[in-house]
UniProtKB/Swiss-Prot annotation:
GO cellular component, one term: cytoplasm
Pfam family membership, one: Ran-binding
Homology family: To yeast YGL164c.
GO MF term list: GTP binding; GTPase regulator activity
Name of the protein described by the UniProt record: Uncharacterized protein C31A2.10
Domain of life: Eukaryota
InterPro entries named among the record's database cross-references: Ran_GTP-bd-rel (IPR008812)
Amino acid sequence: MDQVLSKVTTTAATYATAYAVRTGLQLAGSLVAKRFSKYIQTSAPKSSQFNLELVKSRLEQKIQAITPAVDLIQLVAARGNSSLQNLVPLIIRLRDHIDDFLEFIDYEASGSEKKSPEKADEASEKIFRRCEVLLREIEETIPLINLSLTTAGITLNTALSNTISPSRLLQAQCFLELSDKRFEESHTEIQIGPKFTVVLYTSFSQPSKSDGPLDVRWQETFAKSDLYIKRVVSASQKFSYVICIDEDLNDGRYHEETVGKPTSAPVFGKKLEISLQRMSLLCYTVSGRLLNISQAKSPVLALQLTSIKDVSALDKAHQDNSEDLNNPFIKNNDKTKFHQNIDWIALEKYFEVNALDISDSESEDLSDILSDSEFSIGNRNKNIGNNEYSAQISSDPAEEEIANAMHSLKLEPETSIYLTNPGSLSLLEYLLRLCSLQELHQISCLEMTDSQLAAMLNSN
């Protein structure tokens, strides 16, 4: 996979999802504060409430103070900084001790109404001493965190890179905010933003002729597909997202499934659902570098997928229903589990081929390329009318709501980049970034700090 990384020509942004799910302190700190406050108000003796309130405030302030540094350590360590990776077990242990303290509060609070005054005083004293121990542990951890960050030369930089597109970022955030609102109202699966018509590539490894590293190659998996992000209901997480990819067999090639069917309507084949937790790297390259075709210069958005132990319930269901572990897909029209040995996928914007604009010689060259299913670059056309985009926009309630809001502000849709190019890879990129950010911290992007947003949006 190092060979693939060496071919990446533009910037990359890393998502430390696996670490943050286990070690994030912000969520644990807020839970402790809520449970502690509830215990003080409902179960603690009045004589102990003042002292308990003091240690609770100190604990909450300490956790809030170290959370930005802990988040920074997790992100940098996940990117391969060996000097900070040694701190990750310390952070995990601190998180475990906070969870233990939370369970201890629940244990002492259970049946408190039946306890005698002496037992209630004893329970409050135990909680007070346990909180003091946790505070001392946090205070001992702070110098180690500061020393490691200073030694590694890591700082909290909130300045955004020049490559960040403010317009695309605002458009993606608008989609995300509308979908969050609809999700809170319906509590059902909600699509995030528009559908993107893309060509899907996947990587595979094969033994090299020498004893060197594996030879990593790419193949075209779906010549045409509809990709979208959806927010799903999760029992363990407030924010949980899935990348859905539906193959469209109406791609200009011969398929038995499309015989006798109208060419204007989509004919769906295989389906993929990939948990966003598996995404660890997001980067741009060009299709020719993946497929060893020098003439191909189309931009491609590449995603690295990791195998995580704490898979979501959706992933477990897919794994249990898999019919053939040696095949990344199961029967057509079934939701399938993306096979764990596929480390990368790449997405290229799909273009229709306009037969009227292709000469005979060009048609022969194009057919030669398209006939090679393993290394073909998909159908393309540089002329797509705005009517197709307008139809795509009007089909989504969230997009209609945006259009209505723009109309109320007297903004002309015809002059909007968003309306003239809703299926661009850059919009998909920012949707993936923001959704991953919300799933990472389990809070809305509107509630995040500058450092949290900058750490995810900045490229390295």
